[in-house]
Amino acid sequence: MSIIINNVSKQFGDFTALKDINLEVPDGKLVALLGPSGSGKSTLLRAIAGLEEPDQGQIIINGQDATHVDIRKRNIGFVFQHYALFKHLTIRQNIAFGLEIRKHPPAKTKERVEELLSLIQLEGLGNRYPSQLSGGQRQRVALARALAVQPQVLLLDEPFGALDAKVRKELRAWLRKLHDEVHLTSVFVTHDQEEAMEVADEIVVMSNGKIEQVGTAEEIYEHPASPFVMGFIGEVNVLPRNASLFNYHAFEPHSSNNGHQEPVFVRPHDFELLTEADDASVAGTIKRVIHLGSEIQVEVLLMDNTAVLAYLNREQGQQLNPKAGKKVFIKPRVAKVFAGASSAASTHFIYGTGI
């Protein structure tokens, strides 16, 4: 069941939550709406569900105009961040709730509940109450309850946001495996870049009520459409074009109408650190080293006082043996310039000064 969004906009007073959104979610795909708070991702999900009505535009589900269709008639499964399970009902009763409301035959209901308990890997726990389950197990039950009525579309609003990091990671892998089994058209909201990249077939990056880019995790990471996307999907150094680091590199600087050169964007993984100089490297001093298991973060201050962050894998770290105060030589393997870009701050940007 595909979902098509045509020119959808939504205002809340003076605040524009969505502005001329156009999007197609292909049949059977798992799509992530990714963005910071206030980007419009949850409003778009709620509009698809029927919890918010657009001020303009059209929402088409399975070829039918659902823009003004009541939420109860859309046949959509919805999973919230905080489970919303009935505390006084057992797990079986929670899963069966939607089927019983729809007057489903008892024998069929029982069969469907057992099927879903197996699907969410909670066989044998059907007679327990929500309070007797872990957070991860409760979220699986919430998902099973949403799937019980065999919805056309599954919507998930930050489903793992209330769980700790280890459980979130386990459930991400489980959700991806589950989707590969049921092939239900699904849309989930998240502000977690890693979650979106690990789980989704396609990612919709949103900012300020607009779509910045749509693509696979690889497409968005390797070919970001804007400085916002590059900064939001992973960390990035934003450096002045006249930094000594780029004196040896031949790519042409872009200049804006006012004559200012756009900054250069380099991901921490795209720096190479050397113990000896070559023709394309510049000298710097290591200011700080942070060991993160399989990865090492190295902050380097260049001779012109430009500060950069580089990432090393374990093998590179063993070869370089980075320590604070050590002199190194650094060069970018890959650098990107966006026409019209400025050095406007963003949470995930690492600037070339003041680290």
Swiss-Prot record:
CDD domains (UniProt xref): ABC_CysA_sulfate_importer
Topology relative to the membrane: Peripheral membrane protein
Main EC class the enzyme belongs to: translocase
GO MF annotation list: ABC-type sulfate transporter activity; ABC-type thiosulfate transporter activity; ATP binding; ATP hydrolysis activity
SUPFAM superfamilies, alphabetized: MOP-like (SSF50331), P-loop containing nucleoside triphosphate hydrolases (SSF52540)
Oligomeric and partner information: The complex is composed of two ATP-binding proteins (CysA), two transmembrane proteins (CysT and CysW) and a solute-binding protein (CysP).
Locations listed in the record: Cell inner membrane
Protein name per its UniProtKB record: Sulfate/thiosulfate import ATP-binding protein CysA
Catalytic reaction annotation: sulfate(out) + ATP + H2O = sulfate(in) + ADP + phosphate + H(+); thiosulfate(out) + ATP + H2O = thiosulfate(in) + ADP + phosphate + H(+)
Main location as per UniProt: membrane
Its EC number(s): 7.3.2.3
